[in-house]
């Protein structure tokens, strides 16, 4: 067991599958045009890989292979996508596979610029290297003093052959000829750091974004400033120009706002406020189309269209996830295809495990929607609800009224949500008599019928509300259900029993209809989380002492207790059949407990502590969310498609760290057989031929080999044809020929041997078979295994022929018959192949019973064998009678 636990390198039950809800980060996107397909594609960075979307439908086209570190910058040309990670960058073909890798930098790369058949890379130490793409060789290397000229932007001006323009944090710009390695000109700048460089539609004109929020339109050929614009939102993060006939420039800001400037009138024509909730990482106008692509660190990719008379962009398509870490996730529905998630950004979203086009956002909760509509507030941050801490969902009546209820951080009232309408519901559920600000909702649940919501408060009160009308339907207990804060509420599947638990360490069972206390259980420690599996009636409790207690709500007793976590337990989940309890804790571990055996069967560590776990209703995936992560991570259940050893793990088992899955489906890794050591847990168990010498053991032969041995004559009689087979009519025109290049007729065969006899030689038929020979050998050495194996390999007719040939009349002998009886005795002594011994003995007696009394040797042998058979059957009969007695008692007893 210890060797098996040492060899296990990952989870035995779960394998990383993919990540959901990740679309963008703070790395600027890259837009490419495919001349073959005549389409635009946008590439966004997601951690250690990047996504490629079709702009037309914003559908995911490809996900790249992962790189060892997080991607720090990207670039693309017409054929390849370049991504830098650390001090290395790679070229990807077909948006997926790495075809070239460039190594030479000693510091982190933060700029990449395609340059024909070359690629320019710049690191944080001021080293600029020009590479030949296909040979992966260095063409030129330039070194810049960071204190004098620290590169902050790079651009290849249009029509400027072999020239690049570099911007610096000190404010100056330099124009270099990279072929001759010469500095052509130094622009003094505007004494403010350069943050962005963008080629204008006009030749020789470049837009320069500054730290001060200014955008300078500058002619680099004549070193002349054409116009200046200024934004009050901080440094310019990115710049883009429309090329569809409208002289408009867009500039991004760290506030998430976008300014639209008219280059003819030299004025601001529009503002796109709150285009993103974080800084604009990148914005790009598609060539000759009124479409603007933006992305930001808020995990959103948006496409805006400018088709209105005011010139303001409206949102056309988007892919959006959570912009802040998640607070709660739960599978929604019974098909296991939707996952509801709440985040610290205040949104409630639904992610599809099938395709991203089925994702939808239920939006932010607003305190007063009518006030917002009446006053037309643009900035709704002041009226938004706090983040959702816990929620419960039920789809039974989702088409009739709201089916989701959520409690918010620091709020007394609980909000309802409608999944079908994808919006917040009509009611805020809270007791009317409570007006204290320090009381908050701490636990929620919805009945399986979808009609009632149960809400627990920090004051110890537990209330019931009608989901259709929002009316208060009663409270549990006289004044309050618990003396401390309510930590969990749950209702069984038939609305008969309500279970609540409080911080004072009590677990209470209530009648759901009349709200009367039925039973109370004192816990060893204060509970932290409570979870009910309605189908099995099993209740899981995570306590503050890092242990887990499992109760049966029918008997109201603790049936299992688990310990092993070294940190606070954040969440739990039951498998659909109720056999497994999966727990996630702050010790970065996810443990799987087997409830029938009461053992830990799986455990693995993660590099980030898991906050939530949820098991799919179909049992195929486990969904997790983690600290400081924006995505939902899916783990496939290995036991559904392969054999998994569920042996209990030892108490000193040390789990290994497992990497979080990426955004693409995990591919199988080919490993050479030499490096794979067989694990004890993966070795298939070979059952011995006999578990114990005292146990009667049957053979593994099918019944057709021995069950019908006594009825062979009846079977042959039934299978005998009623009429002899008809001889086909002769066909004289078919004359036999000899094959060859020239066919010749075959001459009839002539029998020229006058000595050939037509009398059958009975001596040939009387030859002894291998079975008889092995029986004769067994009479000498007392070994019958070979003879028994010959019988096992024969069919029913062959067995009858062999046993019939044992008699002296058919070529056998008395000694051979005696040896056969000894073989049967050996089988009964060893208690192996028990049914074969009975069948072979019965057939032997049927064939030779008449001659046994006349032979003293055989009579003595059969007498001993008879007592042996009777002894075995007497023992078996007593066991059969005992088993039948117990079964009859269980059938008739009133338990």
From Swiss-Prot:
Effect of residue 347 to A: In GLC1G; uncertain significance
UniProt keyword annotations, A-Z: Disease variant, Glaucoma, Nucleus, Phosphoprotein, Repeat, Ribosome biogenesis, rRNA processing, Sensory transduction, Vision, WD repeat
A GO term for molecular function: RNA binding
Pfam family, one: Utp21
WD repeats: 30-63, 72-101, 110-143, 152-186, 193-230, 237-272, 277-320, 327-361, 389-428, 441-475, 486-522, 527-562, 564-605, 607-645
InterPro entries named in the record: SSU_processome_Utp21 (IPR007319), WD40/YVTN_repeat-like_dom_sf (IPR015943), WD40_repeat_CS (IPR019775), WD40_repeat_dom_sf (IPR036322), WD40_rpt (IPR001680)
Subcellular compartments: Nucleus, Nucleolus
Example of a GO cellular component annotation carried by this entry: Pwp2p-containing subcomplex of 90S preribosome
Top-level taxon in the UniProt lineage: Eukaryota
Tissue: Expressed in heart, placenta, liver, skeletal muscle, kidney and pancreas. In ocular tissues, strong expression in iris, sclera, ciliary muscle, ciliary body, retina and optic nerve.
GO biological process: ribosomal small subunit biogenesis; rRNA processing; visual perception
Modified residues (Phosphoserine): 382, 399
Misc. comment: Depletion of WDR36 mRNA in cultured cells causes apoptotic cell death and consistently associates with a reduced 21S rRNA and delay of 18S rRNA maturation.
Quaternary data: Part of the small subunit (SSU) processome, composed of more than 70 proteins and the RNA chaperone small nucleolar RNA (snoRNA) U3.
Known function: Part of the small subunit (SSU) processome, first precursor of the small eukaryotic ribosomal subunit. During the assembly of the SSU processome in the nucleolus, many ribosome biogenesis factors, an RNA chaperone and ribosomal proteins associate with the nascent pre-rRNA and work in concert to generate RNA folding, modifications, rearrangements and cleavage as well as targeted degradation of pre-ribosomal RNA by the RNA exosome. Involved in the nucleolar processing of SSU 18S rRNA. Involved in T-cell activation and highly coregulated with IL2.
Comment text on domains: The WD repeats are grouped into two tandem seven-bladed beta-propeller regions.
Known disease link: Glaucoma 1, open angle, G: A form of primary open angle glaucoma (POAG). POAG is characterized by a specific pattern of optic nerve and visual field defects. The angle of the anterior chamber of the eye is open, and usually the intraocular pressure is increased. However, glaucoma can occur at any intraocular pressure. The disease is generally asymptomatic until the late stages, by which time significant and irreversible optic nerve damage has already taken place.
Protein name: WD repeat-containing protein 36
Species annotation: Homo sapiens
């Amino acid at each position: 067991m210890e060797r098996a636990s040492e060899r296990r390198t990952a989870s035995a039950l779960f394998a990383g599958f993919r990540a959901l809800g990740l679309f963008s980060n703070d790395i600027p996107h890259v837009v490419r045009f495919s001349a073959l397909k005549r389409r635009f594609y946008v590439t966004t960075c997601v951690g250690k890989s990047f996504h490629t979307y079709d702009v037309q439908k914003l559908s995911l086209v490809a996900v790249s292979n992962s790189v060892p570190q997080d991607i720090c910058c990207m670039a693309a040309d017409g054929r390849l996508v370049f991504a830098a990670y650390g001090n290395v960058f790679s070229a990807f073909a077909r948006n997926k596979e790495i075809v070239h890798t460039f190594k030479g930098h000693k510091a982190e790369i933060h700029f990449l610029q395609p340059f024909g058949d070359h690629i320019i890379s710049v690191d944080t130490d001021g080293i600029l290297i020009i590479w030949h793409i296909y040979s992966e060789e260095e063409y030129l290397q330039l070194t810049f003093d960071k204190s004098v000229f620290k590169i902050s932007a790079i651009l290849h001006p249009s029509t400027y052959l072999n020239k690049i323009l570099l911007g610096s944090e000190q404010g100056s710009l330099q124009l270099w000829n990279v072929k001759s390695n010469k500095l052509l000109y130094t622009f003094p700048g505007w004494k403010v750091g350069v943050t962005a460089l963008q080629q204008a539609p006009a030749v020789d004109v470049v837009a320069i974004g500054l730290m001060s929020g200014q955008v300078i339109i500058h002619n680099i050929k004549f070193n002349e400033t054409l116009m200046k614009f200024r934004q009050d939102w901080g440094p310019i993060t990115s710049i883009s120009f429309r090329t569809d006939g409208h002289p408009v420039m867009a500039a991004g800001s760290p506030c998430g706002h976008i300014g639209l400037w008219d280059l003819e009138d030299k004025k601001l024509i529009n503002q796109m406020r709150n285009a993103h909730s974080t800084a604009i990482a990148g914005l790009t106008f598609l060539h000759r189309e009124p479409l603007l692509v933006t992305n930001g660190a808020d995990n959103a990719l948006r496409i805006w269209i400018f088709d209105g008379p005011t010139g303001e962009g409206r949102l056309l398509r988007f892919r959006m996830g959570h912009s802040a870490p998640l607070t709660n996730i739960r599978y929604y529905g019974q098909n296991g295809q939707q996952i509801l998630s709440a985040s610290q950004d205040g949104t409630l979203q639904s992610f599809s495990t099938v395709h991203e086009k089925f994702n939808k956002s239920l939006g932010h909760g607003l305190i007063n929607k009518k006030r917002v509509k009446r006053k037309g507030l643009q900035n709704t941050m002041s009226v938004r609800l706090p983040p959702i801490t816990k929620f419960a969902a039920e789809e039974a009546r989702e088409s009739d009224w709201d089916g989701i209820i959520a409690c918010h951080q620091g709020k007394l009232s609980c909000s309802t949500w409608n999944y079908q309408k994808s919006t917040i519901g009509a009611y805020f559920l809270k007791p009317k008599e409570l007006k204290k600000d320090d009381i908050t909702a701490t636990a929620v649940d919805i009945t399986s019928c979808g009609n009632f919501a149960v809400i627990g408060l920090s004051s110890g009160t537990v209330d019931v509300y009608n989901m259709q009308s929002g009316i208060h339907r009663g409270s549990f207990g006289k004044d309050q259900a618990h003396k401390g804060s309510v930590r969990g509420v749950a209702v069984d599947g038939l609305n008969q029993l309500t279970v609540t638990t409080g911080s004072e360490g009590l677990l209470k069972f209530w009648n759901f209809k009349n709200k009367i206390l039925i039973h109370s259980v004192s816990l060893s420690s204060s509970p932290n989380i409570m979870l009910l599996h309605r189908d099995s009636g099993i209740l899981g409790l995570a306590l503050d002492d890092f242990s887990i207690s499992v109760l049966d709500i029918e008997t109201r007793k603790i049936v299992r207790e688990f310990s092993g976590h070294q940190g606070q337990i954040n969440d739990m989940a039951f498998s659909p059949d109720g056999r497994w309890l999966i727990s996630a804790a702050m010790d970065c571990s996810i443990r799987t407990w087997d409830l029938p055996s009461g053992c830990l069967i799986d455990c693995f560590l993660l590099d980030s502590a898991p906050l939530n776990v949820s098991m799919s209703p179909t049992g195929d995936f486990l969904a997790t969310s983690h600290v400081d992560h924006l995505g939902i991570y899916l783990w496939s259940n290995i036991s559904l498609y392969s054999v998994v050893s569920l042996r209990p793990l030892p108490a000193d088992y040390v789990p290994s760290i497992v990497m979080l899955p990426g955004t693409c489906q995990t591919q199988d890794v080919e490993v050479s057989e030499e490096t794979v050591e067989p694990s004890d847990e993966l070795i298939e168990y070979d059952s011995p031929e006999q578990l114990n010498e005292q146990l009667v053991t049957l053979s593994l032969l099918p019944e057709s080999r021995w069950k019908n041995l006594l009825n062979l004559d009846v079977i042959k009689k039934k299978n005998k044809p009623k009429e002899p087979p008809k001889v086909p009519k002769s066909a004289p025109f078919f004359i036999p020929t000899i094959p060859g290049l020239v066919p010749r007729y075959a001459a009839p065969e002539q029998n020229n041997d006058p000595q050939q006899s037509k009398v059958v030689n009975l001596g040939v038929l009387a030859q002894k078979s291998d079975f008889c020979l092995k029986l004769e050998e067994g009479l000498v050495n007392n070994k019958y295994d070979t003879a028994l194996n010959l019988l096992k390999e024969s069919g029913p007719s062959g067995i009858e022929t062999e046993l019939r040939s044992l008699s002296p009349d058919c070529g056998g002998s008395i000694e051979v018959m005696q040896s056969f009886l000894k073989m049967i005795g050996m089988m009964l002594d060893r208690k192996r192949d028990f049914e074969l011994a009975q069948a072979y003995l019965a057939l032997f007696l049927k064939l030779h019973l008449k001659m046994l009394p006349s032979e003293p040797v055989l009579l003595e042998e059969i007498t001993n064998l008879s007592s042996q058979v009777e002894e075995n059957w007497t023992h078996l009969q007593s066991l059969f009678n005992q088993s039948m007695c117990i079964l009859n008692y269980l059938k008739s007893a009133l338990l």
